Amino acid sequence: MKKHRLPDTELARIAPLAPDARRKALLKFKNGFPDFSYEPTRRRLPELTNAQPSLLSLGDTEWSKIESGLKRLKNEKEAASNIEVAELLYNFIREEKYIAVMEPFGKLQLGAGVAISYWSDAIFFGPDGPTIFGFDFRRAGGFNDSARRFAFSAQHEHIRQRGDDYATAKLGLVQFPALRNGTRKVRVEFADQVELIPYDELIQMARETYSVWFEILEQREDEARKTGTGGSWWDGD
């Protein structure tokens, strides 16, 4: 059986739950996997945030060029959703005058083949000093308080705890929820008043969640073999 990873955004939402609630959430996610991805926007984060090799800017990418690339996505819903959040992020970074500098942070290893990332490979310099930003592009069902706490804790462990220039960096998450009229907005949360989760607890939460997740996937594979339907519930990573 191919062991499909959970999206990091789903892990942050599900891992802090109590065991029974965690299993229910994993079953619900398995049965309702989204029909499109925000990966096209994630791949364009350096352009959207105007991330530079250093504090000296080498020029900006025009929004029209990014939009043109996203319009070529074959899935119309995916194209429209990615364009919507990408433009919001593009404008947010420039209106708030953040300067993004490339930094290959990599992923936080949690063991058992699990590695997570709630940040882009850039550090953002603004009026309050350096900030680490993670991005949740979902319209609904995005980070709640406990999921943000999980993500902030991962940011702290992987980047602040390195003991380098970013030990005092602010921790931030940028979300793009929908308003009642259906339009999206930028919502920014910081970890200033959040009690962070210790690293060993973070690892335990992730391992317990993945243990149940792999069990659910294995049961699904067994059912498919018995009924002759074959294949996995999910055809790609």
UniProtKB/Swiss-Prot annotation:
Q: Does the keyword Cytoplasm apply?
A: yes
Single GO cellular component term: cytoplasm
* This protein's record includes keyword Cytoplasm: yes
- The primary location reported for this protein is cytoplasm
Q: Where in the cell is it found?
A: Cytoplasm
Post-translational modification as stated in the protein's UniProt record: Degraded by ClpXP, recognition of SocB by ClpX requires SocA.
UniProt xrefs under NCBIfam families? SocB_toxin
Task: Name the chain's protein.
Answer: DNA replication inhibitor toxin SocB
Organism name: Caulobacter vibrioides (strain NA1000 / CB15N) (Caulobacter crescentus)
